[in-house]
Regions:
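Charged, low-complexity intrinsically disordered terminal segments
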Residues: 1-224
Length: 224
């Protein structure tokens, strides 16, 4: 996949969960049409419950809320959150849920590591932050330190397409929880800033090295 850079975006760097979750929760609270959220981990902690509550409130307002989590990273999601979310009208699924003990087999290592959110197809969040408190760590470890980017502008359409495609794939695979793909919100194509951005995905099949190649090309093209 060749990086398709789009001008006219506004990018906001969010430092760790301290900056990310207030921004995400505010965006969820303002949603009027649809929400897509993907996460490898959805922890049973204060942050997890704050996000779950915000999603439930959005669904109660009539917003289409779609949540996809990994079946190993969020292996307790089905018991910790699924009943509450589905009762509120949230559509939630697990990617490749693990049944029984996790034995090391190559095909079981294919996980959903993406951490993405798209709100009303107008603002997207991309980065490395799971739905988990920064301080939810063993006592002898430092808090998590990671970043996310808030994206507004034409580039949101690329992220929106990716989350809808993943929802379609996981829904097809979840025979007992198949959901019809609703008509999408219209991605915002209006200029939101002066920054150029491209969204790239990585997988172990067709796009294994796309991000690496984009890094190398960007470094080679650097002028300052």
């Amino acid at each position: 996949m060749v990086a398709e850079y789009l001008p006219g975006n506004r990018l906001t760097l969010l430092n760790s969960g301290e900056a990310y979750f207030p921004a995400l929760l505010a965006a969820i609270a303002s949603a009027t049409e649809e929400i897509y959220l993907e996460s490898y981990i959805f922890a049973d902690d204060e942050i997890g419950h704050e996000v779950a509550t915000a999603l439930c409130l959005a669904a109660a307002r009539g917003v289409r809320v779609n949540v996809t989590v990994d079946g190993f990273g969020a292996r307790n999601f089905a018991t910790d959150f699924m009943p509450r979310l589905t009762a509120a009208g949230v559509r939630a699924m697990q990617y490749r849920p693990e049944i029984g003990r996790f034995h090391l087999k190559r095909h079981r290592l294919r996980r959903l590591h993406r951490k993405l959110a798209v709100i009303d197809a107008r603002v997207a969040y991309v980065g490395g932050i799971n739905v988990i408190d920064d301080f939810n760590a063993p006592a002898d470890m430092c808090p998590r330190y990671d970043y996310a980017v808030q994206l507004e502008g034409p580039g949101v359409g690329q992220v929106h397409h990716a989350v809808r495609r993943m929802w379609e794939i996981v829904s097809w695979a979840n025979f007992k929880r198949r959901f019809r793909l609703a008509p999408p919100a219209t991605p915002c194509c209006e200029k939101a800033g002066e920054q150029t951005a491209a969204f790239l995905i990585r997988d172990n099949i067709r796009h294994r090295n796309d991000i690496l190649h984009a890094y190398i090309q960007a470094i080679a093209d650097a002028k300052n």
